[in-house]
């Protein structure tokens, strides 16, 4: 059992998601419906996209705490371009390019200037948030065109166009990380940096790519945010970076790099979003959301930590088992045989 969990760390997140879906069903049978699933998925899309980007960065043994600010900055650019009369495709492409550029800048600080990731992205968190507020003057962006909201309108099976795009991106990234040499380079870089270099992996380039794609995912999350609510507040993206990191940790992505699967991060994001829907079902006031979500997250992390210790003990036991096995005992020769030999 431990070996199975060891090879499938996202199983704990899946169990948490299933339990959080089934248990409220005993209070309200209507909760157990396809409509609930589509509603939770629609709410989870932003966090899923951010968790996917954070996964790439964390696999390389880094962390990015600026993605919330990138999301807000990119959402503001999208709104400004649309209100200036640019078409939706042009505005979306420019928004994605801005996110890519912001992520590239983060990666360059870490890979080329050797600044610790947490320090570099703490700096850019304030920088990007400041740019966002300078562009807006501290005001909200409203009056966005109706075609933007159509991106989040139900299209097929109750899922929007952006929802289907998110599913495709999850499937593609899961395949990329699991089945290609390029994807395995992220694991190698985070697991053993020097070893990866000796194997020919361009570790600096991999880290820059990870941060760049993370920024692009944050920009896409900004587009989703704007399309879902139809306006852009000046606090857009605040606090999302911590939720994205928490979703990854819940899904089995190691903070030490080199291990985890993208599906685990997606399940972690779904779990955190589903907590909010359960609290609404239980009619718990909204100001309890962060407290209860943090409490549940802490409980899951404690359980995950204890499980990790058990797995490590199991691995050590397997590794050194052959050295600890006592040698077979040799039976002493009988006294009769000794006399015959004499």
Curated annotation (Swiss-Prot):
Protein name: Autoinducer 2 import system permease protein LsrC
Intervals, Periplasmic compartment: 1-13, 60-69, 114, 176-212, 273-283
Membrane topology type: Multi-pass membrane protein
Main location: membrane
Signal peptide stretch: none
InterPro entries listed in its UniProt record: ABC_transp_permease
Any one Pfam family match given in the protein's UniProt record, by short name: BPD_transp_2
Function noted in UniProt: Part of the ABC transporter complex LsrABCD involved in autoinducer 2 (AI-2) import. Probably responsible for the translocation of the substrate across the membrane.
Entry GO MF terms: transmembrane transporter activity
Annotated organism of origin: Shigella flexneri serotype 5b (strain 8401)
UniProt superkingdom: Bacteria
Keywords tagged on the record: Cell inner membrane, Cell membrane, Membrane, Transmembrane, Transmembrane helix, Transport
């Amino acid at each position: 059992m431990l070996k199975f969990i060891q090879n499938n760390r996202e199983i704990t997140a899946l169990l948490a998601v299933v339990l959080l879906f089934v248990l409220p069903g005993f209070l309200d049978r209507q909760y157990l419906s396809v409509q609930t699933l589509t509603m939770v998925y629609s709410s989870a899309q932003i966090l899923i996209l951010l968790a996917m980007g954070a996964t790439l960065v964390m696999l390389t043994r880094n962390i990015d705490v600026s993605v919330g600010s990138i999301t807000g900055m990119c959402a503001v650019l999208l709104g400004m371009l649309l209100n200036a009369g640019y078409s939706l495709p042009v505005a979306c492409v420019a928004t994605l390019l801005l996110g890519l550029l912001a992520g590239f800048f983060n990666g360059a600080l870490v890979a080329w200037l050797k600044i610790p990731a947490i320090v570099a992205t703490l700096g850019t968190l304030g920088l990007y948030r400041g740019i966002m507020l300078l562009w807006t003057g501290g005001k909200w962006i409203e009056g966005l065109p109706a075609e933007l909201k159509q991106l989040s309108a139900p299209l097929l099976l109750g899922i929007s166009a952006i929802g289907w795009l998110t599913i495709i991106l999850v499937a593609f990234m899961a395949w990329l990380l699991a089945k290609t040499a390029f994807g395995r380079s992220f694991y190698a870089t985070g697991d053993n940096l020097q070893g990866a270099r000796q194997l020919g992996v361009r570790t600096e380039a991999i880290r820059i790519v990870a941060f760049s794609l993370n920024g692009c995912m944050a920009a896409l999350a900004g587009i989703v945010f704007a399309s879902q609510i139809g306006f852009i507040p000046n606090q857009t993206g605040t606090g999302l970076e911590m939720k994205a990191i928490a979703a990854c940790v819940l899904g089995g992505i190691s903070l030490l790099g080199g291990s985890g699967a993208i599906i685990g991060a997606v399940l972690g994001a779904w779990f955190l979003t589903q907590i909010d829907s359960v609290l609404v079902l239980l009619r718990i006031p909204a100001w309890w959301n962060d407290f209860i979500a943090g409490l549940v997250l802490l409980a899951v992390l404690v359980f995950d930590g204890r499980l990790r210790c058990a797995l490590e003990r199991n691995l050590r036991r397997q590794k050194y088992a052959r050295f600890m096995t006592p040698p077979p005992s040799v039976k002493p020769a009988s006294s009769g045989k000794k006399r015959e030999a004499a």
